[in-house]
Amino acid sequence: MAHPKRRISRSRRDKRRAQYNAKTKAPAVATCPVTGQSHHSHRAYWFEGSLYFKGRVVMTKEK
């Protein structure tokens, strides 16, 4: 039976798998019900000087 000559490290294996996954999956984009802004899912985003997360203002930028 064929078998590998050298053991493949976890990092090398995961790098190979990451290339395949990056090509096949599109980033998850959500639309905020409050602002109507499109953004990445499960991420906070800035809109008109305020930081939003899950439809709520988390932080406001001071001028």
Curated annotation (Swiss-Prot):
InterPro entries documented for this protein: Ribosomal_bL32, Ribosomal_bL32_bact, Ribosomal_zn-bd
SUPFAM superfamilies with a match to the protein in the record: Zn-binding ribosomal proteins
TM regions (residue ranges): none
Entry GO MF terms: structural constituent of ribosome
The entry's keywords: Ribonucleoprotein, Ribosomal protein
GO biological process: translation
Keyword Ribosomal protein: yes
GO CC field: large ribosomal subunit
Biased composition (Basic residues): 1-18
Pfam families: Ribosomal_L32p
Ranges where the record places region Disordered: 1-27
Keyword Lyase: no
Family: Belongs to the bacterial ribosomal protein bL32 family.
PANTHER family noted in UniProt: 50S RIBOSOMAL PROTEIN L32 (PTHR35534), LARGE RIBOSOMAL SUBUNIT PROTEIN BL32 (PTHR35534:SF1)
Protein name, as recorded: Large ribosomal subunit protein bL32
Organism of origin: Chloroherpeton thalassium (strain ATCC 35110 / GB-78)
Encoding gene per record: rpmF
